[in-house]
UniProtKB/Swiss-Prot annotation:
GO terms for cellular component: cytosol. The keyword Magnesium applies. InterPro entries: Dxylulose-5-P_synthase, THDP-binding, Transketo_C/PFOR_II, Transketolase-like_Pyr-bd, Transketolase_BS, Transketolase_C, Transketolase_CS. It comes from the Bacteria. Pathway: Metabolic intermediate biosynthesis; 1-deoxy-D-xylulose 5-phosphate biosynthesis; 1-deoxy-D-xylulose 5-phosphate from D-glyceraldehyde 3-phosphate and pyruvate: step 1/1. HAMAP family: DXP_synth. CDD domains: TPP_DXS, TPP_PYR_DXS_TK_like. This is 1-deoxy-D-xylulose-5-phosphate synthase. Mg(2+) binds at residues 150, 179. PROSITE patterns: TRANSKETOLASE_1, TRANSKETOLASE_2. It catalyses: D-glyceraldehyde 3-phosphate + pyruvate + H(+) = 1-deoxy-D-xylulose 5-phosphate + CO2. Binds 1 Mg(2+) ion per subunit. Binds 1 thiamine pyrophosphate per subunit.
């Protein structure tokens, strides 16, 4: 679309421009903003459904609150494209999630309107509460607002923050963006019911004592399902959130500016913790996304007039798909197997497993700590848990990994998806640290398959062990080596030599084996596929060290404490002095961009490996 398609939006350079518009103009602006988001994401790829669902809420927040003086903290942050567009970044949207371009998440270094960096869920209430308390301590009269989804609200961290906020009595507004409930007809019925309730004697009595009691509604009951179920439609003297010390308001239609703006204006004048429940619809305004918000959660480039289409040529099998197929095959063979995921069914490749084995599939919600200890409890009883989790999210359950699984030496398999660089999602989602943080834990092992075939084999190896094992693999596809049928594993803790050369030996951990092999051809170097960061194949290492002048370790993970460090430790323990060049991800957070380009910038493609090795050890002999 041309800029002429968005005449009002083109006049908005910062939120102050919204505050000069009439209500009718704001509605027109919201329509343009939604169309702009759709047009933009269709050209760059990115998160779509969630952003289409927050258009009116974003317009209302920036209209009512004095941003950036008033702080907005967006939980997870993948719903912030409208926020970015309205805060001076409209013309940079073509660079979204590209190297050097806009982040797909809030980023403090990108804009003063991004008050807190988010990407992992359920952090917003804690951060906003901290900001509210800091404002109080400094004598500043400003508001802090946390916008959190119904999924993120299920995490324990969110409830910990609510508990603290109620006691602190801070000037904090928590907005529950509930997009798990249809707007029509339920909200129409709710609005009628609430209109009757608010005009009745019960509401008047509640108001006299300073309480706003709007009664339980289905999303609230769903959110509080761990608490005693209450009869639908029953008016309670206090909601769950009021028990936490909040004044609960809602639910209201999150797509209706005539409801949102007056409600937010009223709340702005209230002191103490406030809780506003808004109901939105993922994909709002784009029928294809409304019908299938999961498919349009994070699409690539597409034609909005056609929608998502299957590629002309079938894509290569991804590591996620390899895992999903292995999980189903192993479950068919062993009825002790159960699959556990913290709300990542699609992303972790467990859709088919849920269909085929519904009684053995456990989605515990956004609750990584619980997921790990839940698996530990099952393992205690002879069940064989497989926890499918992104590498970056396992960080959230580190104490449980150590205390509840490893300390008790329980046989839990951790399928670590998105290991290494993830590309467009950037530093917040990179799985850079799993090798260092897993290999230092007693009883834990970690495997690094080089390709799709090895991924299936090493998952079987991990499953056969009587102690906890993690198998790390990257996003997307690898070298394209088709997995073998059957469930045979590879030897535990053993690597292999893939190329025999002279003078220099390259020890590759994981999918960087293939650029290492290319570099090995150029340098006439020996190349080993080490497969395991722990236990390290010490026998193979010492054999290689004895026959070469220098060693190079290569891994798509943090160099500090990584597999290269394990090699150096093993050589030192054996009393062997040999120069070792450790190549991997440096001690910096690597931003978003094309994964292949990012690896090349870190010198982890074949050409980069040759450059680094030559710079350290000189050119290949002869």
């Amino acid at each position: 679309m041309s800029t002429n398609s968005f005449p009002l939006l083109q006049t908005v350079n910062d939120p102050a421009d919204l505050r000069r518009m009439s209500r009718a103009q704001l509605k027109e602006l919201a329509a343009e903003l939604r169309a702009f988001v759709l047009d933009s994401v269709s050209k760059t790829g990115g998160h779509l459904s969630s952003n289409l669902g927050t258009v009116e809420l974003t317009v209302a927040l920036h209209t009512v609150f004095d941003t950036p003086r008033d702080r907005l903290v967006w939980d997870v942050g993948h719903q912030t494209y409208p926020h970015k567009i309205l805060t001076g970044r409209r013309d940079r949207m073509p660079t979204l999630r590209q190297l050097g371009g806009l982040s797909g998440f809030p980023q403090r270094t990108e804009s003063e309107y991004d008050t807190f960096g988010t990407a992992h869920s359920s952090t917003s209430i804690s951060a906003a509460l901290g900001m509210a308390m800091a404002a109080r301590q400094r004598g500043e009269d400003r508001r802090a607002v946390a916008i959190i989804g119904d999924g993120a609200m299920t995490a324990g961290m969110a409830f910990e923050a609510l508990n603290n906020a109620g006691v602190a009595d801070a000037n904090l507004l928590v907005i529950l963006n509930d997009n798990d409930m249809s707007i029509s007809p339920p909200v129409g019925a709710l609005n009628r019911y609430l209109a009757q309730l608010m005009s009745g004697q019960f509401y008047a009595a509640a108001k006299n004592v300073g309480k706003t009691v709007l009664g339980p509604v289905p999303p609230l009951l769903e959110l509080a399902k761990r608490f005693e179920q209450q009869a639908k439609g029953m008016v309670l003297p206090a909601t769950l959130f009021e028990k936490f010390g909040f004044n609960y308001i809602g639910p209201i239609d999150g797509h209706d500016l005539d409801s949102l703006i007056p409600t937010l204006e009223n709340i702005k004048g209230l002191k103490g913790p406030q809780f506003l429940h808004v109901v939105t619809k993922k994909g709002q305004g784009y029928k294809l996304a409304e019908a299938d918000p999961v498919a349009y959660h994070g699409p690539g480039k597409f034609d909005p007039s056609v929608g998502l289409t299957k590629p002309a040529t079938p894509p290569k099998q991804t590591f996620t798909q390899v895992f999903g197929q292995w999980l189903c095959d192993m479950a068919a063979q062993d009825d002790r197997l159960v699959g556990i995921t913290p709300a990542m069914r699609e992303g972790s490749g467990m859709v088919e497993f849920e269909k085929r084995f519904p009684g053995r599939y456990y989605d515990v919600g956004i609750a990584e700590q619980h997921a790990v200890t839940f698996a530990a409890g099952m393992a205690c009883e002879g069940v064989k848990p497989v926890v499918a989790i992104y590498s970056t999210f396992l960080q959230r359950a580190y104490d449980q990994l150590i205390h509840d699984v490893a300390l008790q030496n329980l046989p839990v398999v951790f399928a670590l998806d998105r290991a290494g660089l993830v590309g467009a999602d950037g530093a917040t989602h990179a799985g850079a640290y799993d090798i260092p943080f897993v290999r230092c834990i007693p009883n834990m092992s970690i495997a690094c398959p080089a390709d799709e075939r090895e991924c299936r084999q090493l998952l079987s190896t991990a499953y056969a062990q009587d102690h906890p094992v993690a198998v790390r693999y990257p996003r997307g596809s690898g070298a394209g080596v088709a997995p073998l049928p059957g469930l045979e594993g590879l030897p535990f803790g053993k690597g292999e030599v893939r190329r025999t050369g002279q003078r220099i030996a390259i020890l590759a951990f994981g999918t960087l084996l293939y650029p290492a092999l290319q570099a090995g051809e150029t340098l006439d170097a020996t190349v080993a596929n080490m497969r395991w960061a722990k236990p390290l194949d010490t026998a193979l290492l010492l054999e290689i060290a004895a026959g070469h002048d220098a060693l190079v370790t290569v891994e798509e993970g943090a160099v500090l404490g990584g597999a290269g460090s394990a090699v150096c430790e093993a050589l030192n323990a054996a009393g062997i002095q040999k120069p070792v060049l450790q190549l991997g991800l440096p001690d910096v957070f690597i931003e978003h961009g094309d994964p292949a380009r990012l690896l090349a910038l870190q010198g982890l493609d074949a050409e980069g490996l040759v450059r680094s090795i030559t710079a350290r050890f000189g050119p290949a002999a002869g």
